[in-house]
Amino acid sequence: VEYHEFKRTLVRLIPNKYLEVGLRMIYNIEQQISKYLRGQILAASSVAILSILGLFILNQFGANITLILFIGIIAGLANLIPMVGPFFGMIPAILIALMNNIGNDAALFHKIFGTIPSPFFILDIILMFIIVQQIDNNFITPILVGESIGLHPMAVMIVLLIGGTLIGPIGMLFAIPAAGVIKVIIGEIIFISKNSHLL
């Protein structure tokens, strides 16, 4: 309700001469934000599935991690914070592995790759989430979210880097939709400059 009231107020502020351009710009921005949200949902779902799959594989080697669906969902939802999201699933996974394996000598003396000590599979869990995070950072978010708003994957990574450098995690959260909105505005400015005789 508040958004629609804001939108009506915004439309009333547009001069009649530019009403068509203004309405088209508002529509395109809405479409851009909608596509971004769909891309984020797909990316979050992908991270959740990868996290669940990774924990399931660790369980086949005796990690004894329960609630893997819950942990995967946490990792997926936290993925809304670019770059660091998957790590939020790591903490409950480690805590559950510790609680479930107390008194389990096999888990206590477990070695990752058979050589590196990893008590209670802690290093295994950390490594798994690092892998998920790298897949997300380099493939899932740049491709799914970037394509959803028409930005090249490399451009997405640069935008995230700039947002994170300037404002931190909040900057990373809003960097991509802000870039999408700027892209729409620049597109409209170019359109107006090329078709000024029609206005």
Where are these regions (language model features)?
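Hydrophobic alpha-helical transmembrane segments of membrane transport and translocation systems
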Residues: 104-105, 111-199
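A short hydrophobic/aromatic micro-motif that marks alpha-helical segments and, especially, helix-coil
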Residues: 16-18, 30, 97-100, 165-167, ...
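Active-site activation/catalytic loop segments of kinase-like enzymes and analogous catalytic loops
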Residues: 95-108
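Detector for methionine-enriched segments
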Residues: 25, 83, 90, 99, ...
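Juxtamembrane/interface motifs at transmembrane-helix termini
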Residues: 27-29, 40-45, 57, 92, ...
